[in-house]
Design a protein with these regions (language model features):
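A eukaryote-biased sequence property
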Residues: 2-21, 37-41, 55, 207-211, ...
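N-terminal uDENN/longin-like adaptor modules and analogous extended polar/low-complexity scaffolding regions
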Residues: 2-238, 397-400
């Protein structure tokens, strides 16, 4: 929809107070307490006149008050110009005053940061909110220009832990908006604003949509994440594919488990899992030729039981699923190491793997990580466990007896 351009008014801090920068708050976002804001940050050296004025002011204060140690004054002038937001004017002012102290730190880190802040909602109501903020340096074509500029992207949500759990999703979303920031700095209404207004729907609610679309078959995605199996989504809805990809990323164990060993050490034990095919049928997503372990089925049941409790509860269940897997994996690696010299530890490893509900996945991840097969004795223990557990799956329980020769 075409918009009428207005002359923007800038205050001394670089704040663009034109009405065109602010969108109307949607009833849904106001009800959730979720908002967004985008700023253009500018940092430039202070002029000689500004520095001289500050020096004179400081001298006057010193002559009137006792001498006290003060931090050195910054030699740069910082400002934030509002580009787009759906916050009210008072709340936006709170946010801008909060951010001006954070941007310099954000520019040193490409990741996003989450902080709590006091924000005014309505005329007199003040409460604590969480703010995700991420800065992207703006490239300048003028190499001799001394000022530094950056885009600052902010998402506001209640202080309930949502932004912390979905921080990685917000970082990826922010980076995906960078081309829109650089190409649409003037007209946000037709491009960037539409994406920003959906940030909560895109970055947070995908968990609910996946659980709703897969129902109990969400266990297949959990299994694929543990097995690191590729997932191919065939659907005419690009949002479905994006949701599945984000859910798989949320379920993977990257960054939680030990680093894998070199390719030479694990090549003999690595297996490439078969790809999972997902298609859309009758508004449901169906996984073809895919099974899930009892362990993943139990965690899928927890997700289904809590499907109406909101994205925060669902994400906590996913995080619990990952933590339990890491704990079990560490236990298996410890027992296998002890079993190299202790038959009782071998028995304990066998009993645990038999009852855990996903022994094949745990052992394969341990093999891929490399430490359990780093020695001939460790390789022998793993081979024996795999042999006995496979036999048990077919013909009932058998007690493993390690060849002591």
């Amino acid at each position: 929809m075409p918009t009428t351009k207005r002359a923007s008014s800038m205050d001394s801090t670089g704040y663009d107070s034109s009405a065109s920068t602010q969108s109307n708050q949607s009833s849904a976002s106001a009800l959730r307490g979720t908002f967004y804001a985008v700023y253009l940050y500018t940092s430039s050296p202070k002029t000689q006149q500004q520095q001289q004025s500050e020096t004179e002011t400081s001298a006057d204060e010193t002559s009137q008050k006792p001498v006290a140690t003060k931090p050195p004054k910054s030699q740069t002038k910082e400002s934030l110009s509002l580009l787009a937001t759906d916050l009210g004017a008072i709340a936006e002012t709170d946010l801008r005053c909060f951010l001006i102290k954070k941007v310099a730190r954000d520019l040193q880190d490409t990741r996003g940061n989450v902080d709590s802040m006091e924000m005014t909602f309505g005329e007199k109501t003040t409460g604590t909110a969480m703010c995700f903020h991420q800065a992207f340096t703006k490239e300048s074509s003028d190499v001799e220009k001394k000022e530094q500029q950056a885009y600052v992207l902010c998402f506001i949500a209640p202080d309930d832990g949502t932004l912390d759990l979905y921080c990685t999703d917000l970082e990826r979303f922010g980076k995906s908006l960078l081309p829109l920031l650089t190409n649409s700095e003037v007209d946000f209404k037709s491009t960037l604003t539409n994406s920003l207004e959906e940030w909560h729907y895109i970055c947070v609610l995908y968990t609910n949509r996946c659980v709703e679309a897969f129902a109990e078959n969400i266990a297949v995605l959990l299994q694929a994440a543990l097995s690191e199996a590729p997932v191919n989504v065939t659907t005419g809805n690009s949002r479905d594919k994006s949701d599945v990809e984000k859910f798989m990323e949320a379920c993977n164990l990257h960054g939680l488990e030990s680093q894998k060993r070199g390719h030479e050490e694990t090549e003999s034990g690595c297996q490439s899992p078969a790809a999972i095919e997902i298609v859309s049928e009758d508004d449901r997503l169906i996984a073809r030729n895919a099974d899930a372990s009892p362990f993943c089925q139990r965690w899928a049941a927890r997700l289904m039981k809590s499907k109406d409790d909101g994205p925060l509860v669902l994400r906590r269940i996913v995080e619990g699923f990952k933590i339990r897997t890491i704990q079990n994996l560490n236990l298996v690696k410890r027992l296998v190491k002890e079993a190299e010299n202790d038959h009782y530890a071998l028995f304990n490893a066998y009993q645990f793997l038999k009852k855990c509900g996903y022994w094949e996945t745990l052992l394969q991840r341990a093999i891929n990580e490399g430490s359990v097969v780093a020695t001939p004795d460790g390789r022998e223990v793993v081979d024996l466990l795999q042999e006995r557990l496979a036999a048990n799956a077919l013909a009932g329980s058998q007690l493993p007896v390690r060849n002591s020769a």
